[in-house]
Amino acid sequence: EYVINDLLKNGIISIILGRTAEKVNIKYNGKNILNKSIEKLRYQWEKTSYDLEKHQANPICIKEEIKNCYYRTIPKFYIPRELYKIINYPFSINKYKPKIAIINEEGSNGENEMAFCFLEVGFEVYNVNINDLATNRYNLNEFVGIAFVGGFSFSDVLGAAYGWYFSIVNNEKIRNQFVDFYNRKDTFSFGVCNGCQLMSLLGWIPKGITLEHNKSNRFESRYSLVRIEKSNAIMLNNMNGIEFGIWTAHAQGRIVVSETIQKGISKDKKKSMFPIKYLDDKNEITEKYPFNPNGSENGRCAVVSDNGRHFAIMPHPERCILKTQMPWIPENLDDKLNKYTHWILMFRNAYK
């Protein structure tokens, strides 16, 4: 309908030749030569790839993917009505520009996207390599915010973010800067992907939480559906209830919680500690592959500190703030959003 209207506006005559259906029906000389459902044909088309993947990844996950993808439906994205005006309304940036350090190390690759997000909402952004802290080019006491970026620091040869972690804790000058920053009451930090793994090692998110290898035993790059739940995370203020797509790209993103935490905190606190969850096509929290790309229990993909100021997430919201960065948005939401998606609200919340 949209295409036809656009063609008519431009004086182009068009004819509808047919419409898509749930079955492929091909006739020749009045006889059916093919009459099969899209699901069966898609499975036949993808079967060779699945057979190869069984030798390249965890075969249990691949079998699960075949089963779960066979009956896939269109997922529902949801943004509370009252947020549309906030997302689309020009964000008021005052003269005060808080300073944020975009922390990176050799092998990091997400600093440009992260810098753009914070620049877009009024921060004064600095690209800070760990070596800059050792040479006194910058000092963390200058900043109110830290963002640990994604990527593969030191190629993860020592384990995810371990090389980055050791470059901090094994240098007294650098280590003390991070300790002082964390202990201040006027600061916040945000870690994505490799940055999330680093925050776990530093203990900036609750101790006893580790990031382990994906159950699929391979790197996963997918467009996943997640839900934001109520928590004390300052960057998620007033965002609970949103269900939306987000990019994921990691090999070691499965959140594992120690028995001490499992037994030592209440169910409600445990729920608020992990404020973002993976969903399936029915918008239910899931551990099923590939909806949950790493197999984290109870769909967990983010974690926040007790005071709400330190927030870490495995997926990449910094790659999703613009509509043009999204591979797909339902038509009913696409029409309601202008330039930004709701993910911009995370960075606006940090500014506030």
Which residues does each predicted region cover?
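Short helix-loop-beta junction
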Residues: 112-127
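Cysteine-nucleophile active-site neighborhood
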Residues: 152-233
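Short acidic/histidine-rich motifs immediately flanking catalytic phosphotransfer sites
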Residues: 138-147
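Generic beta-strand/beta-sheet core signal
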Residues: 1, 15-20, 29, 103-105, ...
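Beta-strand->loop->alpha-helix junctions that form or flank phosphate-binding loops
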Residues: 6-30, 126-132, 210-218, 275-277
